[in-house]
Amino acid sequence: MSAKDPKVVADLKYTRNIGIMAHIDAGKTTTTERILYYTGKSHKIGEVHDGDATMDWMVQEQERGITITSAATMAFWKDHRINIIDTPGHVDFTIEVERSLRVLDGAIAVFDGVNGVEPQSETVWKQADKYKVPRICFVNKMDRVGADFVMSFGTIKEKLNANPIPVQVPIGMEDTFRGVVDLLENKAYMWDQSGMGDHFEITDVPNDMKEEVNRFRTEVIEKIVEFEDELLEKYLNGEEVTVPELKRALRKGTLELKAFPVFCGAAFKNKGVQPLLDGVIDYLPSPLEVPAIVGHDPERPDKEIICKTEFDAHAAALAFKIANDPFAGTLTYIRVYSGEVKVGEQLLNPRTQKKERIQKLVKMHANSREEINSLKAGDIGAVIGLKFTGTGDTLCESSHAVVLETITFPEPVISVAVEAKSSADQEKMLAGLAKLEKEDPSCRLRTDPETGQILLSGMGELHLEILVDRLLREHKIQANVGKPQVSYRETITVAAKAEHVYEREIAGETHFAKVSLSIEPISQADGIQFISKVAVSKEFTAPMLKAAESGFREAAEVGPLASCSMLGIKGTLNSVEVRPDSSSEMAFKAAASLAFRDAVKAASVELLEPIFKLEVTCPDDFVGNIVGDLNARRGKILAMNVKQGGGQVISAEAPLASLFGYATDVRSLSQGRASFSMEFLEYAIVPAKVKTDILHKMGRY
């Protein structure tokens, strides 16, 4: 069946793949719970603060009242199937947001009606911009003291440089909030104050709001008609513009990322969720309306392959998350981009060159599941029992191999040493750590080459705390966990070249390889890159090239200053010498590794440390204390702005090494009245004096 087939078009036209994203505590999970309740998936509304929210199904999530992993679920609304992913808002779990956005077609951005756009909202918004995800906005908590729709709307415009279009305005604010006015339909939606918000009445706009609503409505219509030339002409000619025409034009603007429709409500009080669901259908794209994904040929990376959203095309799917289920084993969440993935068939993973049999396919509802026989293009589900597939891998037909663009993962910035209490626990611990690393690519495992300790690295203190908690609980292990340490990195500042001849006799056989390579500094965000100017041939085979790259990358894991992983280096293989009788993969791996080490010695190595971006909100009386303290922590003050309603917002950057325990210190500096948020910004070169101190502490001087 092709995408022209009416059944396929109907199927996909009525599908939405969406995410719910926001700053921590803006009400994402509560909004999702309401959506599940109103779409009939959940017979009882789960509350985050009671620890029984459906989407928060890990023990750690229910205890902390925050979302850590992206739970995926399917719901139905007005003949449409909606696949929903609830993403975490805490900065330590940015990776979960990143990988969710990679496979979604649209998103609901939830904002706190009291605070408007907050730091993590900005981060998530930028991630959605990166993947060109159309969004609708939901200004939540309109019933809270201090709720201000106009202020929140303004922050979307100013802080996010977006073009928000209000499709609703609230009726009442704070404790008088009782409904919304739909500006396109010019009707009021009033919710019953009692009950679960199932029942609402659609009535005329309240008399005391008519004048204001008419003014707003005219402004909104004037903005919307600009998205369609014919409609603009019609409007300028003084003709009546209908509601369906306005919705069609606003949909066009939303899909082109020129507009972001704004809804409002109070999810906790069950108000405003049904019109938001209508907004998902009216303004967010179906899989047919997003550009076809482009992959490339694994054998020829410069050859592009377009994966069309068609059921009869060759199968291609992206694995975007791995989870371990205590009963089912490994669950691999996939988004199918073209063709159909069926139970019983074998698919190829081009990265590992291994074939995987699709034993079981399931549709997920948070942590319960329903077995299905196939997943078609445009759909999201999970495969049970894949052995060799990781996050960001492609699954495709071996006769039509394709590699889809993978997911980029941030560098971990903080680590702890983990040591099993007994030798019996040691094996269990290593198996448990390997599982965690497979599930969560933003956590890394490495053995310290000096001490032999196992180091678990992650994106922040909370992230590490939860990883360790899961390790101990899920795998029933007793372990000693060290204090969190900063994960330093190393880089080069000048280009260098080296060549190395490896010739050795092992077990009576000679192994020979000669490589010449050059290295140069690149952006730290680009990690370690390797390219070859030497073409694969009969003599210099593809496995030899792969072995040389492997040797290069492994050598970059241990820097010369402090044995830290290296970043920001591009390596180029310039030439090789092959002897047909004695050259081997092992020899090329060793030669490339040793050539890299020789080149690094001449490349002026520097130590890198993670820098964090901070935003501290505090009353005016304590600004001096906070700024003085940040300066003492090697911080850099970037801006100070007056906060609406009083107080100051201080924007700063500071090294992570100086921020351990900052939450406690900031409370005592402000008598408990300051709040702050921080997120990873970049790795930067450590100043010379500080570098000497760090290397002394590491025993490197």
Swiss-Prot record:
Signal peptide (residue range): none
Q: Which GO terms describe its biological process?
A: ribosome disassembly
**May I have one GO cellular component term?**
cytoplasm
GO MF terms on file? GTP binding; GTPase activity; translation elongation factor activity
Q: Does the keyword Protein biosynthesis apply?
A: yes
NCBIfam families (UniProt xref): EF-G (TIGR00484), PRK12740.1-5 (NF009381), small_GTP (TIGR00231)
Q: What does this protein do?
A: Catalyzes the GTP-dependent ribosomal translocation step during translation elongation. During this step, the ribosome changes from the pre-translocational (PRE) to the post-translocational (POST) state as the newly formed A-site-bound peptidyl-tRNA and P-site-bound deacylated tRNA move to the P and E sites, respectively. Catalyzes the coordinated movement of the two tRNA molecules, the mRNA and conformational changes in the ribosome.
Provide the primary localization: cytoplasm
Family annotation (Pfam families): EFG_C, EFG_III, EFG_IV, GTP_EFTU, GTP_EFTU_D2
Q: Which residues form a coiled coil?
A: none
Q: Where in the cell is it found?
A: Cytoplasm
Q: Which family does it belong to?
A: Belongs to the TRAFAC class translation factor GTPase superfamily. Classic translation factor GTPase family. EF-G/EF-2 subfamily.
Per UniProt, residues of the tr-type G domain are 13-288
Q: What is this protein called?
A: Elongation factor G 1
**Which keywords does UniProt give here?**
Cytoplasm, Elongation factor, GTP-binding, Nucleotide-binding, Protein biosynthesis
Residues annotated to bind GTP: 22-29, 86-90, 140-143
